Amino acid sequence: MIKIANAPCSWGVLEFDLAEKSKEKGFQEVLNEIEATGYVGTELGDWGFMPTEPIGLRKEIQKRKLELVGAFVPVDLSNKDKHDIGVVNALKIAKLMSDANYNESFIVLADDNGSNFERTLNAGRVEKSMMLSEEQWKVFAHGTEKIARAVIEKYGLRTVFHNHCAGFIETPEEINKLMELTDPDLLGLCLDMGHYAFGGGDPLVAIENHKERIWHIHFKDYDPLSAKAAKDEGEDYFGALKRGVFCELGEGIVDFQSIVSLLKKLNYKDWIVVEQDVLPGMGNPKNHAIKNRNYIKTLGL
């Protein structure tokens, strides 16, 4: 049975070091609103956003009758010198989830999105010249496997890779390449529908192409008009976020009805996590969460 979660990023709790960080909501308010709006799971958010000791973490999550389903771990994977600290950070988070008895949770690995100027400026319009070289691909793939292997060997948790704009694994071509270069038993795919659409792809095609690798799913919609406005004004990824490029579910161009039909056909039974990435202080996250949950109900979930 597919279960529906939400995540702190829908409340503006993002991994980026932004001026708007001061507007972030506290974890108790976020968890209260996730529960109140009809979701049954959450992801962890940034390290330190929620309690970082297992008893306290489990107490807060159980208090709201939620499950912890994953934790986002950004790593500069194209830089070999950053792999070891990536392992350390992933193991720190995996230990917390394991010690809190969330043994089905995923490490949601990603590039260090937003750190590369060219990729951040050109989110949604990446050209071939902006992609990794063959040598960089080897380094990147090695880093993902190194982290995933360390996590499963030490704590038994699985790792999925999150496609994401403003990072090196954004386009369908890049996602295909990473899946080709990595062990299918070691690394799964966290397919984010909105980022995939923003990156120039059709999520339905991605599901068909990677159905054996998709272990975790993020539901996010995409508004191409906001993306075009950002492009026309020379704005980067964060400018597109401010314009609402990731709109409420059903308001963009992602065909969720067909996606759900295909997932059911493929017998997908894991979590779907709603992520409506917004900057801290943007909009009314609780209202967005209500509308997104109501929309998902129209899909039979």
Indicate residue ranges for each PLM-predicted region:
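Active-site acidic/histidine proton-transfer and metal-coordination neighborhood
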Residues: E67, K82-L189
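Active-site beta-loop-alpha junctions enriched in small/polar residues
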Residues: C9-W11, G45-W47, V73-S78, A110-G114, ...
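Conserved beta-strand positions in the central sheet of alpha/beta enzyme cores
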Residues: E43, G70, F106-V108, V160, ...
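Short, flexible, mixed-charge acidic loops at enzyme active sites
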Residues: A19-K23, S115-R125, A227-G239
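A short, acidic, amphipathic alpha-helical segment used as a generic capping/interface helix at domain edges
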Residues: E251-K265
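Acidic/histidine-rich catalytic cores of soluble enzymes
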Residues: T42, W137-I253
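A short, acidic, flexible beta-alpha connecting loop/helix-capping segment that sits on the rim
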Residues: V273-N287
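N-terminal pre-domain/capping segments
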Residues: M1-N103, E134, K138-V139, E145-K146, ...
